[in-house]
């Protein structure tokens, strides 16, 4: 069945601009029996049937592949005439979560598979009166634009629409729709003259607001994860975590469904009485596995908080952090996937994300930084670890059917990096625009590379080359499962790694060909690929002076290296988890942080909920 057999991509009869909101209206007649709405939009949509909301939250696609939602609207329909109204937001900017690809709406209404209404030029459209168009104000570069709602009286002039040219390769939404939970009301807290409201814990969802104004005016709601400064810290560098509401005189009620927010606190600015403020929480629908009885006391608190952290970072796809970025990264999601096999019964979300990532290829066959996105400062280390995530999925689920779907992407990554090996037998750091990042620590973050297009001196990094070996071993195993081969001379790369980075006088591996700095993560990766000796273990345990400790995101590789190489590793790993994660709990964490430095990191932009920090789930299940 061609679902969109007569439907066209449409927009109002004018060229679309950035941050434009358009509503569309179409009437249809039905019995009704089984009536379904098939719908997709660029950038996002909210759909209503007979004034009742039936769906929102577009799954963002690539330029050559879009995704549609299928919604059973039978219970919203009546016999005879019905009205479909759709508000569409065209954001018009690239971000870490979306690719700007024009403005448009396409839909088909079907009763018992017969098309009874569809998007075409006869569909009425107008600028939306519920949103203020053309206010281009970024929340963050990763999230994209903020949004302004409007309750003032404005006339909507409905006219015919026009057809627009957008991709007709439309596939079903690859993941389930979000689960909408009961509203969570924020309560005012005692402050010195500021209107601050507390949700009680870290949450993620959509803001709702009821206010009363003496006259028309602007109300601004800002949101954040803490009140360390005695207020909600919402302007951080170039970031602006705020939503605006143009209010009429009297009472206004808003539900802002175009911007998903996260945090714990709201602060309200403007000449208004706040009647109610809170969040409509949303989570990806999952069934949590019972926690093993052996996980008790502090370990159980850590485990439960880690699961909560995972849930807050799963919506249309995995997210690094729900507050600041909401972006899908390979390395962040690899940690989330690994923990999810233990935390939840389902694994369809992991599979869908792995397949979706595989489509985010650059011209040179490496992966973009996030998905869907274009022209990103892509990270080679993240690309090379993609086969590892696929391998772990196959091991955890037994589902080998994913391998043929993503093998070309994996092979492209591995062949591209292998083809860059120089006469020193190693993969060099990649030139601009690549970002040679490994973790947020000294000498591993590539800070000086972001936005710097100047030529770079040839340099070799320990972690990239060890990660290639680590990934190639797993990629080869995946290839064997489908009768293919992967031919890489890993022994030669190992010899080159030892020759370039091993320091025989200490047993450590230096991070780079450019300096002798040693990190816990670098030595851990050396052990993971079979290099080093017993002395290297002391650096992985951070028992030697000057070793740069691994950050929360990379602790899994440290723990794996110790478990592989040290018969006494179990207590070390458990003690390390308890020390680091109890510290966050003692500081009031209701989800686990991006780094152990909390909100003060990244020039006061550290996230207090980050999916990559859920790793205790994996180790508590195995080591207790």
Model-derived segments and their meaning:
Residues 325:
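Phosphate-binding glycine-rich loops and their immediate beta-loop-alpha structural context
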Residues 1-320, 332, 348-349, 353, ...:
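Extracellular/oxidizing-compartment recognition motifs
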């Amino acid at each position: 069945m061609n679902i969109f057999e007569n439907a066209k991509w449409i927009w109002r009869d004018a060229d679309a601009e950035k941050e434009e909101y358009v509503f569309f209206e179409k009437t249809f007649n039905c019995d009704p029996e089984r009536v379904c709405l098939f719908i997709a939009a660029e950038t996002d949509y909210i759909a209503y049937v007979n004034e009742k909301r039936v769906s929102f939250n577009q799954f963002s696609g690539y330029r050559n592949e879009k995704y549609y939602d299928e919604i059973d609207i039978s219970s919203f329909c009546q016999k005879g005439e019905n009205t479909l109204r759709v508000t569409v937001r065209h954001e018009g900017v690239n971000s870490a979560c979306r690719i700007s690809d024009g403005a448009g709406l396409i839909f088909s209404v079907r009763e018992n598979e017969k098309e009874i209404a569809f998007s075409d030029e006869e569909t009425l459209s107008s600028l939306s009166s519920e949103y203020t168009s053309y206010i281009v104000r970024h929340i963050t570069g990763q999230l994209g634009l903020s949004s302004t709602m409007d309750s003032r009286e404005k006339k909507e002039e409905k006219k015919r629409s026009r057809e627009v040219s957008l991709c007709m390769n439309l596939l079903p939404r690859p993941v389930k729709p979000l689960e909408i939970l009961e509203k969570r009301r924020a309560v005012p807290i005692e402050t010195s003259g500021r209107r601050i409201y507390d949700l009680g814990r870290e949450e993620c969802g959509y803001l709702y607001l009821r206010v009363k104004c003496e006259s028309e005016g602007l109300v601004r709601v800002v949101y954040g994860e803490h009140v360390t400064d005695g207020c909600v810290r919402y302007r951080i560098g170039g970031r602006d975590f705020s939503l605006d509401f143009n209010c009429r005189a009297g009472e206004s009620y808003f539900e802002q469904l175009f911007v998903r927010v996260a945090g714990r606190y709201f602060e309200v600015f403007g000449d208004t009485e706040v009647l109610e403020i809170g969040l409509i929480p949303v989570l990806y629908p999952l069934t949590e596995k019972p926690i093993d009885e052996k996980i008790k006391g502090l370990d159980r608190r850590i485990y439960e908080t880690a699961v909560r952290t995972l849930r807050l970072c799963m919506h249309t796809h995995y997210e690094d952090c729900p507050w600041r970025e909401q972006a899908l990264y390979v390395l962040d999601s690899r940690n989330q996937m690994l923990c999810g096999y233990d935390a939840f019964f389902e694994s369809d979300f992991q599979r869908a994300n792995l397949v979706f990532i595989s489509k985010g290829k650059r011209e040179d066959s490496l992966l973009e930084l996030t998905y869907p996105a274009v022209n990103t400062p892509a990270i080679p280390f993240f690309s090379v670890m993609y086969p590892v995530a696929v391998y772990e999925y196959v091991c955890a689920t037994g589902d080998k059917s994913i391998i043929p779907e993503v093998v070309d992407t994996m092979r492209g990554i591995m062949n591209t990096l292998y083809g860059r090996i120089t006469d020193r037998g190693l993969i060099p750091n990649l030139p601009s625009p690549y970002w040679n990042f490994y973790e947020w620590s000294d000498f591993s973050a590539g800070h000086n590379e972001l936005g710097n297009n100047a030529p770079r001196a040839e340099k070799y990094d320990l972690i990239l080359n060890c990660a290639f070996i680590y990934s190639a071993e797993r990629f080869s195993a995946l290839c064997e499962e489908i009768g293919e081969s992967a031919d890489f001379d890993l022994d030669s790369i190992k010899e080159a790694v030892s020759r370039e980075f091993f320091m025989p006088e200490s047993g450590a591996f230096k991070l780079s060909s450019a300096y002798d700095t040693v990190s816990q993560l670098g030595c851990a990766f050396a052990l993971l690929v079979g290099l080093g000796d017993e002395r290297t273990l002391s650096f992985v345990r951070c028992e030697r002076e000057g070793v740069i400790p691994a950050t929360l995101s990379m602790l899994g590789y440290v723990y794996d290296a110790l478990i592989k190489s040290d018969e006494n590793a179990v207590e070390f790993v458990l003690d390390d988890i308890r020390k680091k994660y109890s510290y966050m709990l003692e500081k009031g964490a209701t989800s686990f942080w991006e780094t152990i430095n909390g909100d003060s990191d990244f020039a006061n932009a550290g996230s207090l909920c980050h999916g990559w920090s859920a790793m205790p789930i994996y180790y508590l299940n195995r080591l207790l």
